[in-house]
Amino acid sequence: MRQRTIVCPLIQNDGCYLLCKMADNRGVFPGQWALSGGGVEPGERIEEALRREVREELGEQLILSDITPWTFRDDIRVKTYADGRQEEIYMIYLIFDCVSANRDICINDEFQDYAWVKPEELALYDLNVATRHTLALKGLL
């Protein structure tokens, strides 16, 4: 089984949290709402990976004004690729509290939508199990 270290930003701006709706046909949680993030490449520093993933998934214009390591966890997930293949992966999540200086988002094709959500409205979204766990651990659910 392959192992991946995943950097995952919990991005907050003006009291709201950024959620991204995964594409329906790929990813670990197709069609569900999630936090952004992705894998650390070999030789890449963790904060560099976090900033790269934010740029790739959310666009160059989103500015993170604060990044603080928060917690970590692990689990085993099945990833679905765009061609329909599936793979079981051992995932190590490094989760960061992040504050953005703006809300300028340009999502890539991994996502079909995004939303800035007030804490009291987070439970209304179809959150994947990992995001639900993270938000509950943070006291937001």
Curated annotation (Swiss-Prot):
Keyword Hydrolase: yes
GO molecular function, one term: dUTP diphosphatase activity
Catalytic function, reaction form: a ribonucleoside 5'-triphosphate + H2O = a ribonucleoside 5'-phosphate + diphosphate + H(+); a 2'-deoxyribonucleoside 5'-triphosphate + H2O = a 2'-deoxyribonucleoside 5'-phosphate + diphosphate + H(+); dUTP + H2O = dUMP + diphosphate + H(+); dTTP + H2O = dTMP + diphosphate + H(+)
Domain Nudix hydrolase: 1-141
EC number: 3.6.1.9, 3.6.1.12, 3.6.1.-, 3.6.1.23
Sequence motif: Nudix box, positions: 38-59
Pfam families per UniProt: NUDIX
Required cofactor(s): Mg(2+)
Alphabetic keyword roster: Hydrolase, Magnesium
Class of this enzyme: hydrolase
PROSITE patterns tied to this protein: NUDIX, NUDIX_BOX
PANTHER family, A to Z: GDP-MANNOSE MANNOSYL HYDROLASE, MUTT_NUDIX FAMILY PROTEIN
Protein family per UniProt: Belongs to the Nudix hydrolase family. NudI subfamily.
Its job: Catalyzes the hydrolysis of nucleoside triphosphates, with a preference for pyrimidine deoxynucleoside triphosphates (dUTP, dTTP and dCTP).
Quaternary context: Monomer.
Record protein name field: Nucleoside triphosphatase NudI
Upper classification of the organism: Bacteria, Pseudomonadati, Pseudomonadota, Gammaproteobacteria, Enterobacterales
